């Protein structure tokens, strides 16, 4: 298969590229000027366009993962602007380019996030649940809506509403490993807030699965089937490392580091129902923390 990918140098993107290439698929990477290069790279500007779309012709699938890191610092007005534009305008730019191809891809799989549901500690949300009212939920709603041109061009479009992707090599887990290894890790706030997570290998498998499953379209919740709280994760990681986890991080400290708005998202969350993905035949390798924990503390 010929596959187009944005965000190919990111945490999830690089793992997905490796998996696809290992199985013999051709991956064409859309990269920014000054970014990664190579014979498989096509330059684009997410905010303005793709100068040469000929390399996209004849693709079977598109994986769209590009976007400004949401939790990498306080949500200042400038960062909010970059986060929103990188997702909304970037998605609209890509969808427009795909819609104008003579030979269009069958499917476009877009990253989205659990943040679309806002904060709701009661019950598990499904893909039909209403979106939240906070700023992050608004970003996710506009992010998904920006792919309308692809849908209008009869490209099957899937939005992967992901929880936190876990692997020691990157993402949130890499950031917290050192304090946990030093015995300084602990729950965030009360620790009772929902924490929707998925291991990196399951995320890669799920993206590939939905691209190959014609019956799946629209939003798809993506996290481990087991409902977990922050304290559940904290205990599992401490056990994996053989270290105590008795030093909680107070809410005030999180607010001082990240600002009130981002802190509210960190200290909140939702449980997600993944019945749509399970009913379509997907099998998780790490459906719960007990099975994922050996990986959590790997070097």
Show which residues each predicted segment covers.
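Mid/C-terminal beta-alpha module of Rossmann-like enzyme folds, strongest
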Residues: 213-260, 294-299
